[in-house]
Amino acid sequence: MNAPAVPPAPAAARRSKAPLGVKITGTGSCLPATPLTNAHLEKVMETSDEWIVQRTGIHSRYRIDPARGESTHTLAAEALRRALAAAGLSATDLDLIIVATMTPEMSCPATACRVAADVGASRAGAFDLNAACSGFVFGLNTAHDLIKGGAYRRIAVVGADCLSTLMDYSTAGRGTAIIFGDAAGAAIVEACDDPGKGILAQSMHCDGDGWKEIYVPECERDFPEGVACDPSKYGHVQMNGAAVFKFAVGTFSDLIQETLDAAGVTATDLDMLVCHQSNMRILQSARERFGLPEEKLYVNIDRVGNTVGASVPLCLDELRRAGRIAPGQKVMFVAFGGGLTWGSSLWQL
């Protein structure tokens, strides 16, 4: 019997000198190969392109194909490879990998550990974070503060979700199946010597009593009090659409204002608002409340749907590749989701 391979020695535990600033040095993203259009959904459930677009603004989303080897961890790994390339780094340069996901393929190990193996990050620590759609923003705040405190110098934050694995693609499940898509996005966060770079204000919130508005039951005890157990719903996202919409509309704008106030800036100081892509009406409502021009609120929900924890980093990567964000700008990231959770991160890039 062969002895197990001895892994490379990890980076020595230490408390390094705290940096003056923190910066995002690279981004990457990955979509599955197969788009899932409204026209396709019309063939498998009672719905229409017009009905979907009017209510969500979504024309298409992407769905993994396991036969192609696509999964949460493979999308996450590819997004991270692209982020490392953009930052001019190798995987062995990483100190830590944080993967925000609510669709791990296994209970153990963490998706982050499989991502570390796939990319060759032999010296990095790794763990998962589950805050649903808020996950990447929570991870970004966590990475920033770990670096700011001097514990680490270079962290990868990945948001990856494949909600297609939790969907019921029949008329019974159309309330959620029309909304969600699969994707992954990643950002490299590093220490720097510029004190002007990093988070100006951040927040992370939870209303645990709202858990029953978005949940995935696995057995009888997982259903909220007063809701009859239905085994056909096991493993499928259950969402109270009206309650979630009301929560999002009320919370979204308040969260943005709270973050602006904490940083001592106004909406006109923002160069870009990068929001979780949940619903076109919610996005436009927030933009109008703060008087932002269309070019300062990025939108891709029409092309990719609601990609949950991948939503914000996917937007960030598309903006970077299009040259629409640059060092020195103020960019706010905002997200909300199951839990109920919501959070923000206002950066001086």
What are the residue ranges of the model-derived segments?
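Buried hydrophobic positions in well-ordered alpha/beta secondary-structure cores of metabolic enzymes
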Residues: I24-G26, I52, A83, L94-I97, ...
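Flexible, glycine-rich active-site loops centered on histidine and acidic residues
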Residues: K148-A183
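Short beta-strand segments
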Residues: T25-G28, A100, N130, I155-D161, ...
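Anion-binding (especially nucleotide phosphate/pyrophosphate-binding) glycine-rich loop
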Residues: A86-S122
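Short glycine-rich phosphate-binding loop at a beta-alpha junction
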Residues: T92-A100, A267-H276
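Claisen-condensing/thiolase-fold acyl-transfer catalytic domains that form or cleave C-C bonds
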Residues: P4, A9-P10, H73-L80, L84, ...
